[in-house]
Amino acid sequence: MKNEVKTFRLFVRPDEKSRQIADKIRALNERTTHPLVESDDADLVIAIGGDGTFIDAVTSTKFSKNIIYTGIHTGTLGFLQDLCENDIFSLIQYINYEQELKTRKVYTSCVKVYLKDGNTYKFFALNEAIIAGDNYSKITFAEYINDELLQNVTGNGIVVATSTGDTAYSSNANGAIDFSNNCQLVCTLLTPIRNAAYERFITNPIICSRINLVLKPCDNISIIIDGKKKNIDSSMIGRVEVSMTNSYYINKLDIMDYSKVSIIRNKILGY
């Protein structure tokens, strides 16, 4: 990762509030020697909008470890967008005059999709991967921990969330919230069926670093990464592996010292 910021780039959500904040940043930055660029080799990326804008910025720059990412929210405090409009001047001062920027690692999951014809797709997820039936129809799949069968499941699918994304779709599906700050995955089944006709599901596991969650579907499935459905022929998917290790991460600017508890209290509970 680059230790010094010489150039930075803006990713702006297409709404009036976000555009106004971007204009303020451009005006303030005219007095500095750090140019704004549009290339993927910028040292710093500033996402302006919501957490979705941050995810789009990281995805567009291919989860680069050579970039420092930060975000300015235009609504409520986010888990990724932890700066607000009032922090703009301090941010410009910080990136222009600090000798060494304080960063922290935000871990991502790695999703590998193995097709029946031998081809493989690889994706990274900041928030979650959802493996579900086409149009969230009922599916049956086998769930493995590494090479060992854990359970056979019939339901609408499974959400595999990072510790960053476990308060998003995963929590809406009654998934656990991980406060450990460890590199691990929170797995939540989507409306699993439990009756005499189907094998009873066992658990929603939390998968630690360097352990693979392996899913082998019996039906056609869809792969949704951070809210975006991947264009893969669902009838060709033979196996999906999701893992998280210390080598999968992005570098995030760490100016504000918000705890996960305080963000949940502010963003989700509203007090």
What is the predicted function of each stretch?
Residues 105-109, 125-127, 137-139, 156-158, ...:
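A generic structural signal for short beta-strands and their flanking turns/coil linkers
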